[in-house]
Amino acid sequence: MTTSASSHLNKGIKQVYMSLPQGEKVQAMYIWIDGTGEGLRCKTRTLDSEPKCVEELPEWNFDGSSTLQSEGSNSDMYLVPAAMFRDPFRKDPNKLVLCESFQVQFEGPAETNLRHTCKRIMDMVSNQHPWFGMEQEYTLMGTDGHPFGWPSNGFPGPQGPYYCGVGADRAYGRDIVEAHYRACLYAGVKIAGTNAEVMPAQWEFQIGPCEGISMGDHLWVARFILHRVCEDFGVIATFDPKPIPGNWNGAGCHTNFSTKAMREENGLKYIEEAIEKLSKRHQYHIRAYDPKGGLDNARRLTGFHETSNINDFSAGVANRSASIRIPRTVGQEKKGYFEDRRPSANCDPFSVTEALIRTCLLNETGDEPFQYKN
């Protein structure tokens, strides 16, 4: 397995400079989703003082022709700050700033700025207090694309001992996981936990519960932090939903969803109603649940390795081979939440959460989202 050249630089030398005082100035790292709908870009600017809220942050611009978001002849694009976090790499008072991207200033979002519409949809149902929790699976790779810790000319032992495993022969890359976890806590990201997954070198972290639009904000920033931590260690975190073909588990982003009514007494009734609506709109959700409209998920949702079949909708209590799982405790208590197991690891959480709201709460039907008037 190959690690990056940058990871071999002397980090102690860097720390000499990072410990220098920065006066009253603040470094703000602006983050946005590029034209792939999966990749993240970032750049930093200096502020004269520490911003207390996202509204105090200035808008900025970038070259969209270099991020697959515009043509070179008209490449200026705009960044509008949307959410602000503490910077775990430069530390206080510096900030991470998740931004929405726009083609022309104030004239419509970029194609991969799915947050813009998601925010409108979330605002329409804010009185129902939708909560989400997303389980982000990922796989650690060397820069040569070989899974971290796997034999160079073969495969590790079969799946079985790796899920929540302990020991050098079972847990591959825990240092990265622990560093990411602590960095998220420092940043203020709502990370709920982490665990080793079924395939060796595959891990999961959970974000939530988050209400409304904050689900996407927190997951995207958690992904950014993971990429930056991996950069320091010289490895890659991939969200490919099936990074290794064959008899190995894929990677998903199981999404847990509830409303205030579902969480209250006899909320199971509303959970079952939502599942019935989802059953009639399966293909719409499949298209919304990965950035390639279902093509990525087709490699993962095979009906094997704890997945449902991409062509069929199913639901059940404690059933990890179903499209929708109702946790056993929810079935017993008759209130709580349900888990949509279809989203791929590389999904856009804004797309996933918006689709759930449209179908379950706005009662949309059909294969296309409804266009609401402003």
Swiss-Prot record:
ADP binds at Y337, F338, E339. It catalyses: L-glutamate + NH4(+) + ATP = L-glutamine + ADP + phosphate + H(+); L-cysteinyl-[protein] + hexadecanoyl-CoA = S-hexadecanoyl-L-cysteinyl-[protein] + CoA. The modification N6-acetyllysine is found at K11, K14. Pfam families: Gln-synt_C (PF00120), Gln-synt_N (PF03951). Residues 24-106 form the GS beta-grasp domain. L-glutamate binds at N247, W248, R320, R341. The keyword Metal-binding applies. It is a lipid-anchor. Decamer; composed of two pentamers. Interacts with PALMD. Interacts with RHOJ. Interacts with BEST2; this interaction tethers a fraction of GLUL to the membrane, causing a decrease of cytosolic glutamine synthase (GS) activity and inhibits the chloride channel activity of BEST2 by affecting the gating at the aperture in the absence of intracellular glutamate. This is Glutamine synthetase. The gene is GLUL.
